[in-house]
From Swiss-Prot:
It comes from the Eukaryota. The gene is EXO70. It comes from Kluyveromyces lactis (strain ATCC 8585 / CBS 2359 / DSM 70799 / NBRC 1267 / NRRL Y-1140 / WM37). Belongs to the EXO70 family. This is Exocyst complex protein EXO70. Disulfide bonds: none annotated. PANTHER family: EXOCYST COMPLEX COMPONENT 7, EXOCYST COMPLEX PROTEIN EXO70. It is found in: Bud; Bud neck. The lineage of its organism: Eukaryota, Fungi, Dikarya, Ascomycota, Saccharomycotina. Keywords: Exocytosis, Protein transport, Transport. It holds the Pfam family Exo70_N.
Length: 619
């Protein structure tokens, strides 16, 4: 055996160790590869499991969160279902207050739902939110339908029937008013408030318009024909205006009842409601004004009535902010211009009619012009109210004719009083003055064509007694018409005093010849200091008696031909003649009756006999 070097032995041992180590390392490397392969496979297998697990964790969280959310709104859903049951029924069945209360509750639940979920869109409960909103929408729509039904409980009607029977226009009872107020209160702070107010206005305007439509056809014409004079009160505008004012008053009350808690809104709603009604009324007024303008001669007096109606409407709108009122006032001004012309035209008409009288009536009575003119003046007086409102913008000079020969009976006090009532009294007094002036002028022109016309002076003129009698007869008729018509109240005490002044003037005309007769009996002193009458003076006394008797019998004969139908005038004239003639004759008779040896030879009448004759002359 050979010996081995120790170092070599170490190398051999180390080399063997390295071989073993290399083999081990190779085995470890193979094992690690297997482990790596196995780990990779395991990793591939666990990745979807982890994802699923993560998804399950998320799902578990969502389920738990949803369960928590459902638990949090479960009470709201239960509460909402109770109120939904109410809203699914009719208002008439469940009652208005419970119905409105249910809508409020649903609205509160919706608001609470938003707060609990801390989300503005409440997306996880979008279906529930949508359903609640739909419930509120449907509920409010049903309220509007019910409100409309309440409004329509009063349907259009013919207001003329109610006015004829003096029945008030239909109005809602307290229950309906209360229900409508509840609905309006509900919508007060709602976005649909304007919509419910518009519904209210629309339905009320519809009711009024369709009701007034029954009367509107009668406003299209003023009289039954183009040449037919207007009869007071016959225009359909009167009924239309009366009905419209009734409706307007009703609407004012209704708005106050429904908006009693919101007084500031009342004028606004009233104006919106009335505006279309007044607009249609304006069309009617304009149409009638044009008719007046086209046929003033026959229907002109209607302008006073129309003015009254327009004034009534304007008074009802006073203080209300309604733009149409200004247009209506402009129409009133135009109508009153037509009325102003009627005042002037009446005097032109009087002048034309009196000048058309060709001669005095054979009985010295009332001619056709007097009857016609007084009829026109009487008709004028029927429109007292309209005349008063029209004349306040006029002066007396606007109707007086430019004729210097006229002696007006108006007093200074009347001239200074510029009130409407006094101006109207002056107008009617002037018209009567002008009528009698025209009659007197024509009487003098026809009876005394060769003589100057005396109208302003107190000079005597031919046929003065007959003319006086003629004028007294006419004044008697005028007086009767005055007493039986509105002229009496229009004239008043000052105007009636003017008639009395005319009566005295014409009585003086009538007794003028009697006054001349009595002047015969005015004597100088015929009796001497011894109480005797000289033969020369006796002849003068005889002549005076004879002249008086002749004149007396002539006047008696003439006076007996006059027929007086007015008992009051008979009495006045008889008294005037007796008081004028009898005292003078009695004085003269008593003074000279004993101057003659045979008195009856020269003295035809004793005072009592004279009085008996005088009593027979006025028939």
């Amino acid at each position: 055996m050979s010996s081995i070097d120790i170092n070599e032995a170490d190398v051999i041992v180390l080399s063997e160790g390295l071989k073993k180590l290399d083999s081990l390392y190779s085995e470890m490397s193979q094992s690690l590869k297997k482990i790596s392969s196995t780990t990779s496979t395991a990793s591939q297998l666990f990745t979807p499991i982890l994802k699923k697990n993560q998804q399950l964790n998320i799902l578990q969280y969502n389920i738990e969160s949803s369960l928590n959310s459902v638990a949090s709104v479960k009470d709201l859903a239960n509460d909402a279902s109770k109120h939904e049951i109410i809203l699914e029924q009719s208002i008439a069945k469940v009652g208005l207050k419970p119905y409105i209360n249910a809508i409020h509750k649903i609205d509160d639940i919706l608001e609470d739902l938003n707060e609990r979920t801390h989300s503005n869109d409440t997306s996880e409960f979008a279906g529930m939110v949508t359903h609640l909103k739909e419930l509120i929408f449907d509920g409010e729509r049903n309220l509007q339908i019910y409100f409309n039904k309440l409004l329509n409980s009063i349907q259009p009607f013919d207001p003329q029937i109610n006015m004829n029977k003096k029945i008030p226009f239909p109005y809602y009872d307290d229950e309906y008013l209360g229900q409508m107020s509840l609905i309006l209160d509900y919508f007060e702070n709602s976005t649909q408030n304007a919509q419910i107010v518009d519904l209210f206005i629309k339905q009320r305007v519809r009711l009024i318009s369709q009701s007034l439509a029954f009367l509107e056809p009668f406003t299209k014409q003023i009289s039954s024909g183009p040449n037919v004079p207007y009869q007071k009160g016959s225009s359909g505008v009167n009924s239309y205006t009366e009905a419209m004012l009734g409706f307007i008053a009703n609407e004012n009350s209704l708005i106050q009842d429904l908006y009693s808690k919101e007084t500031s809104r009342q004028p606004v709603i009233y104006a919106k409601l009335c505006s279309p009604i007044i607009q249609n009324y304006l069309k009617i007024i304009r149409h009638n004004r044009q008719l007046l303008k086209d046929n003033r001669e026959n229907i002109g007096l209607f302008s006073f009535e129309l003015s009254d109606k327009v004034n009534d409407v304007l008074r009802s709108l006073r203080g209300k902010d309604i733009a149409e009122a200004d247009y209506l006032n402009s129409e009133l001004i135009e109508i009153q211009r037509i009325s102003h012309s009627l005042f002037q035209e009446l005097f032109a008409y009087i002048n034309t009619k009196t000048r058309s009288m060709s001669q005095l009536p054979s009985d010295n009575g009332v001619p056709e012009p007097t009857v016609d003119i007084m009829s026109k003046i009487r008709k004028f007086s029927e429109y007292k109210s309209g005349c008063l409102s029209t004349i306040q913008a006029m002066s007396r000079s606007q109707w007086l004719p430019k004729d210097p020969k006229i002696s007006w009976t108006i007093t200074k006090n009347q001239l200074e009083d510029l009130s409407s009532a006094n101006l109207l009294s002056s107008f009617f007094g002037d018209a009567i003055d002008y009528l009698l002036f025209g009659l007197e002028r024509r009487a003098q022109e026809t009876l005394n064509p060769q003589h100057e016309i005396h109208l302003l002076s107190n000079k005597r003129f031919p046929n003065i007694q007959r003319i006086g009698f003629f004028l007294l007869n006419n004044l008697s008729l005028i007086d009767q018409i005055v007493q039986r018509s509105e002229i009496n109240s229009i004239l008043g005490s000052a105007g009636l005093a003017r008639l009395e002044s005319l009566r005295k003037k014409y009585i003086n005309y009538y007794v003028s010849d009697w006054r001349d007769l009595t002047s015969i009996l005015l004597d100088q002193i015929f009796v001497d200091s011894s109480g005797k009458v000289s033969s020369k003076e006796k002849d003068q006394i005889k002549e005076k008696f004879k002249k008086f008797h002749d004149g007396f019998e002539d006047l008696v004969s003439r006076s007996k031909s006059y027929r007086i139908s007015d008992p009051a005038l008979k009495k006045i004239l008889r008294q005037e003649i007796l008081s004028l003639v009898l005292p003078m004759y009695e004085r003269f008779y008593n003074r000279y009756k004993d101057s003659f040896k045979h008195p009856r030879k020269h003295i035809k009448y004793t005072p009592s006999e004279l009085m008996n004759v005088l009593n027979t002359i006025i028939k």
